[in-house]
């Protein structure tokens, strides 16, 4: 009886402990599942955030915000996800999220600084490479030119002499043409001067002829006027002579009348008788 009781009690204890173990195992399994789900959710969120950050960094690099304020706003929007949940399904505190945000900003600043440093370093290296390449190319070109000149020295001298002779011939031809143009220009100028002088002489002769004609006309007119004056003077003189003769005649007649020599009065005779 005692053994059966002990066995039954042990069996009941065993069943209770097994039930309790099953419950614990089921709880641990559910917890592990929740942990796994939370881990997956956090991973998916992290991957989404990373993708968002990458896309925003690309958009920032493409659009190039015009000021630090715009970049800070972009960074805040990129680094302000909803409340995070830990593996136990609990929300992470704001302080830890702020710390993570600050840490993330510092890491982004460091990454940006490192990227800018690498870009500057790459630009400096590219510039140095470009300068070195240009210097080497210049040296190589100068060396090749010098070698080519040395090889073709005689040919170059002959070509230079030929070009000098050709230039001399061209210059002589141009000089002769210039002298001929000057001579033709001088002849044309001389002809123009002679033509101008001839025209001036003809104009002077015409003016002299016109003056002589006017003088002759004036002289003829003056002579005619003088003849008229002489004729007038002659007429005046004749008229004066006529008047003088008429006056003398009248005077004589008056004297005759006064003296009685005319037929109108008898003649008076005076005789002296002689005494014996």
UniProtKB/Swiss-Prot annotation:
Presence of keyword Nucleus: yes
Organism: Gallus gallus (Chicken)
Family: Belongs to the ARGLU1 family.
GO biological process: mRNA processing; regulation of alternative mRNA splicing, via spliceosome; RNA splicing
Domain characteristics, as noted in the entry: The N-terminal region can bind RNA; preferentially binds 5'-CGG[AG]GG-3' motifs. The non-classical LXXLL motifs are not required for nuclear receptor coactivator activity.
Motif (LXXLL motif 2): 204-208
Comp. bias intervals (Basic and acidic residues): 67-87, 96-117, 240-256
Function text: Dual function regulator of gene expression; regulator of transcription and modulator of alternative splicing. General coactivator of nuclear receptor-induced gene expression.
Gene Ontology terms, MF aspect: pre-mRNA binding; transcription coactivator activity
Keywords, comma-separated and alphabetical: Chromosome, mRNA processing, mRNA splicing, Nucleus, RNA-binding
Gene designation: ARGLU1
Positions with biased composition (Basic residues): 1-30, 38-59
Chain intervals for the UniProt region annotation (Necessary and sufficient for RNA binding): 1-77
Name the record gives this protein: Arginine and glutamate-rich protein 1
Chain intervals for the UniProt region annotation (Disordered): 1-117, 240-276
């Amino acid at each position: 009886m005692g053994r059966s009781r002990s066995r039954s009690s042990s069996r009941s204890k065993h069943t209770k402990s097994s039930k309790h173990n099953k419950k614990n195992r089921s709880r641990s399994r559910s917890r592990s599942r929740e942990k796994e789900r939370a881990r997956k959710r956090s991973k998916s969120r992290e991957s989404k955030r990373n993708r968002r950050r990458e896309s925003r960094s690309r958009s920032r690099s493409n659009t190039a915000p015009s000021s630090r304020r715009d970049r800070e706003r972009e960074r805040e929007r990129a680094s302000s996800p909803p409340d995070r949940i830990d593996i136990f399904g609990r929300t992470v505190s704001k302080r830890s999220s702020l710390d993570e945000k600050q840490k993330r900003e510092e890491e982004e600043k460091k990454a940006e600084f490192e990227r800018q440093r690498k870009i500057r370093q790459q630009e400096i290296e590219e510039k140095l490479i470009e300068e070195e390449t240009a210097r080497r190319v210049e040296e190589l070109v100068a060396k090749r030119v010098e070698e080519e000149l040395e090889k073709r020295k005689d040919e170059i001298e002959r070509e230079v002499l030929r070009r000098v002779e050709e230039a001399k011939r061209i210059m002589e031809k141009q000089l002769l043409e210039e002298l001929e143009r000057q001579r033709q220009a001088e002849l044309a100028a001389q002809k123009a001067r002679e033509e101008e002088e001839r025209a001036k002489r003809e104009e002077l002769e015409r003016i002299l002829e016109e003056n002589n004609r006017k003088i002759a006309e004036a002289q003829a007119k003056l002579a005619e006027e003088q003849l008229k004056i002489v004729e007038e003077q002659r007429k005046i003189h004749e008229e004066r002579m006529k008047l003088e003769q008429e006056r003398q005649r009248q005077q004589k007649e008056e004297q005759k009348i006064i003296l009685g020599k005319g037929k109108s009065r008898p003649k008076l005779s005076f005789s002296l008788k002689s005494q014996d």
